[in-house]
């Protein structure tokens, strides 16, 4: 869990523009905004960098700080908590799309034992070695943008046999009563209209799905 003071500092850096790219930021200026000493501000920057929430670089005119993807995710998780507090009636989202054929990457990655163990540990089911690929309709593409604030689970990467495997994010969901999860590999950039879904069974066979069939994905939170 992120310490409250680190989260406060991270939020301040983001408000100053750190999510858009490196910004000039001295320890003294950060301390002035937060109402703390430059020494304390420096320690917080070091702590954020250690957690890989920010990057720091020195240039002739001073220090530049940028919020990383991990830092953005920490802020989005905090935002998701506030959504649950102030908008309790928003219990979930529904994505609608059509089934499409994938390129086989999902089958490969889901067949790697360490991936299967990690996904099984955080989702409560051992994933079938393959994914269901869905192309979203226009309305669901817009809905998908809100999912950045949903309850994603980070799955860390690992190294095996001198090869590095990237991490991923998974979002628990339901398809016609089957427990599933949307999976987004950290090293892959998918079009905004496409999602990959994993489950404990072969969804195509279990639900008798073919390419171009319409399907709904339900994402809920407590």
Swiss-Prot record:
The gene is ribK. InterPro entries: RibK_CTP-dep, Riboflavin_kinase_archaeal, Riboflavin_kinase_CTP-dep, Riboflavin_kinase_dom_sf, WH-like_DNA-bd_sf, WH_DNA-bd_sf. Catalyzes the CTP-dependent phosphorylation of riboflavin (vitamin B2) to form flavin mononucleotide (FMN). Belongs to the archaeal riboflavin kinase family. SUPFAM superfamilies: Riboflavin kinase-like, Winged helix' DNA-binding domain. This is Riboflavin kinase. Residues 93-222 are annotated as: Riboflavin kinase. GO terms for molecular function: magnesium ion binding; nucleotide binding; riboflavin kinase activity. Residues 1-92 are annotated as: Unknown. Mg(2+) binds at residues 131, 133. Pathway: Cofactor biosynthesis; FMN biosynthesis; FMN from riboflavin (CTP route): step 1/1. FMN binds at residues 188, 196. The keyword Protease does not apply. One of its GO terms (biological process) is FMN biosynthetic process. It is an enzyme of class 2 (transferase). Keywords: Flavoprotein, FMN, Kinase, Magnesium, Metal-binding, Nucleotide-binding, Transferase. Its EC number is 2.7.1.161. CDP binds at residues 102-107, 201-204. It holds the Pfam family CTP-dep_RFKase. It catalyses: riboflavin + CTP = CDP + FMN + H(+).
């Amino acid at each position: 869990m992120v310490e409250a003071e680190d989260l406060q500092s991270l939020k301040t850096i983001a408000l100053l523009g750190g999510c858009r790219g490196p910004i000039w930021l001295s320890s003294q200026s950060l301390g002035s905004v937060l109402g703390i000493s430059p020494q304390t501000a420096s320690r917080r920057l070091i702590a954020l960098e250690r957690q890989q929430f920010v990057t720091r670089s020195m240039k002739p005119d001073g220090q530049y700080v940028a919020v990383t993807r991990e830092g953005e995710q920490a802020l989005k998780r905090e935002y998701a908590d506030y959504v649950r507090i102030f908008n309790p009636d928003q219990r979930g989202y529904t994505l609608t799309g059509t089934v499409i054929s994938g390129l086989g990457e999902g089958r490969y990655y889901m067949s790697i034992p360490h991936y299967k163990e990690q996904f099984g540990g955080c989702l409560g089911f051992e994933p079938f070695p393959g994914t269901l690929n869905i192309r979203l309709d226009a309305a669901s593409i817009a809905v998908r943008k809100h999912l950045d604030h949903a309850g994603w689970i980070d799955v860390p990467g690992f190294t095996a046999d001198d090869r590095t495997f990237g991490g991923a994010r998974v979002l628990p969901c339901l398809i016609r009563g089957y427990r599933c999860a949307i999976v987004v590999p950290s090293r892959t950039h998918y079009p905004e209209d496409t999602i990959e879904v994993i489950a404990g069974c072969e969804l195509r066979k279990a639900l008798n799905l073919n390419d171009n069939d319409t399907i709904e994905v339900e994402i809920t939170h407590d």
